């Protein structure tokens, strides 16, 4: 793993940039066009190697009552397998080339603020087709999910009572957006239409 970066502190914020490169050995993957029928995993797995690299940037800036955060990452994760020399280096299942995030906040009072945030990500690599069947050798690691994005809104209230602290957070995830299907199945137990999810928390530190 190799990584290097640069950080700069400004009067009312900071910015930073970093680059990295990683190598991976003995990567496991299911062979293309394979149905798992028993516990003999050795029959279904192939072994290879991989690497990943990327560049990440972050900006935070305040202007009076406003604050802005922006982040962007370009990253690639690749794998190659001796059993598939014709495919060369293919994207890994964790390959998400572009990730963009941002949040804009406005301080309503000395204790409260309102925020709008969002993110945009490339689609994940598919390992099953539209009929949930294994992909063929020709289609192996060639297809992606659609672009993933969402916009959230939130309100926070923070009040100190001597050495005690009260923190209230309210908001809505995915006011508009399109999420990964597994994100919806894994994390959304209560939601409105369009996978819109309300949230709230009340914390008291003493």
Task: Name what the model sees in each region.
Residues 91-206:
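Conserved C-terminal beta-signal and adjacent last beta-strands/turns
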Residues 31-41, 75-85, 130-137, 179-184:
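Flexible, solvent-exposed coil segments and beta strand-coil junctions
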Residues 14-16, 27-29, 33, 67-69, ...:
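Short acidic, gly/pro-rich beta-turn/loop elements at beta-sheet edges
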Residues 8-12, 61-65, 159-163, 206:
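A generic beta-sheet turn/junction motif
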Residues 1-46, 51, 66, 79, ...:
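Membrane-embedded beta-barrel scaffold of Gram-negative outer-membrane proteins
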Residues 2, 55, 153:
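Residue-level detector of short, conserved catalytic/binding motifs and their immediate flanks
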Residues 19-23, 41-130:
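Gram-negative outer-membrane beta-barrel transporters
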